[in-house]
Amino acid sequence: MVRIIKWLIGLAVLSVAGALIAAAVIYFAIMPGLPDVTELKRVDWQMPLSVYSKDGKFIAEFGETRRSPVSIDDVPAQTKNAVIAVEDAHFYKHIGVDWRGIARAVWLTATTQDERVPGGSTITQQVARNFFLTNEYSYFRKFKEMLLALKMEKELSKDEILELYLNKIFFGNRSYGIVAAAEYYYGKKLEQLSLAETATLAGIPKFPSTGNPTSNPERSMIRRNYILQRMFEEGFIDREAMLSAQAEPNTAKRHEQQVQLHAPYLAEMVRIEMVRRYGERANTGGFKVITTVHSEDQLSAERAVRTGLMQYDMRHGW
């Protein structure tokens, strides 16, 4: 019996040693090829090309994404707390990887069917994945994600990492970043959002296309109420605030920027010239072009053309 126990102990020691050696080999094989995370200190955010008249009337927008980068200093505490409560409650305590969070996620996934279960990835890991990796799941990719997160925590402050997350993450409907999401779903600035609206936005990134408040209001409200509960559990809000916000209806709707001056040919001329000057960066560099065309002059010209064509038809017929 003693011999068997010794054999089992020896086997366990060998297994642990083998796992550590394998991890070390993988670590030293991967580390040299990891991206330089200091690049995240100078991110060139993709933003659309906007065209305006001389007097500031909106004419057109070109680009695949909506985004308005925001400094972490300008993000309300309520917004930060909602995101942290649902995505990474230990964000300001861990070193990039939250082992307790991973264990909790594995346990809840194995024992429940609740899709609201938080993932094991920290906010830092999500930033690493969104900037440097793909969403394809594999243990190798997950290991790289963890190593990148550890590197990021050494090079960047917690606030810098949270700022990257809030500006990078996808919120559905071409909206990237929390500011663009607030503008699209509520037509508001971050500081104007109610607690319920803030919690709704914080819940979108998990299901940005199928769970946002306009595509699936019911699913969105379930997740909103869960986030409000998490904010209460983490001490960010009191019970009264939680219950009050949970009772609010879904008020989200699409807020597209309305064209104030219809001049598609002018807009296309501007786009072509910008591409000639700046290449593809024209559609992603966040350029705001103020043309020399005044809206009243454009409208007067259109009226003159229409009047002239009508008079020509009246004189010459069809």
Predicted regions: what they are:
Residues 1-52, 90, 110, 264, ...:
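N-terminal type II signal-anchor transmembrane helix
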Residues 24, 115-318:
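Non-catalytic, structured segments within soluble enzyme domains
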Residues 30-82:
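Terminal hydrophobic membrane-targeting helix
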Residues 57-67, 102-109, 141:
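N-terminal periplasmic "start-of-domain" segments of outer-membrane beta-barrel proteins
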Residues 58-61, 91-94, 210:
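Short, solvent-exposed loop/turn elements at domain surfaces
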Residues 71-123, 177-181, 186:
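Flexible, acidic/glycine-enriched loop-and-adjacent beta/alpha segments
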